[in-house]
Amino acid sequence: MKLVEKDAEKKMKNVGASSTAEATPIVLVVDDNKAVLEFLLLLLSKNGLAGIGASSGSECLAIVRSRQVDLIILDVMMPVMDGLKACEELKKMCPSTPIILLTARDDMMTRAAAMDLGVSEFVAKPVNNRDLMSRIQVQLRNLEWGKAADQVVSQIDRSTSHPKK
């Protein structure tokens, strides 16, 4: 049991520490405005994160079906499938993936609908770069902590389970 506890302590201490062996987090950015999309992808890149762009809710869903992403930044006001509808579908597909909702529509009804859907953060446009990057880092750190905690629990479960006789 001591080995498990030491390993658990080590994993929890390493959470948040960058390592070349760890994969770069992948952030999916969804915005129908090409200039905003390109700007956000550049901001992510300058901060050491990998970004994938999508210009619609349906394109976002197709990407999430084909690959894993660590975080989604989603615009609310988009044609065909708005960000709230896309968020509803995303929460069915990948419920533990954090979603940051980005919008020029900062009203209480939109905010309430977003929170009801389980959005992690709600950011109003125009975006403050530092604020957005801070929120992204917090969500990625929380995700990393959650994964580390799951690994520790799994390891403890394996070490304490006994074969049935």
Residue ranges and their predicted role:
Residues 38-46:
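Charged docking surfaces used in two-component/phosphorelay signaling
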Residues 55-59, 82-86:
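Acidic catalytic/metal-coordinating carboxylates
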Residues 1-26, 140-165:
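Non-catalytic signal-transmission and effector/linker regions of two-component phosphorelay proteins
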Residues 78:
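Receiver (REC) domain active-site loop signature in two-component systems and cognate sites
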Residues 67-73:
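Active-site beta3 strand of CheY-like receiver
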Residues 109, 127-136, 144:
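C-terminal output helix
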Residues 85, 106-121:
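Alpha4 helix (beta4-alpha4-beta5 surface) of REC/receiver domains from two-component response regulators
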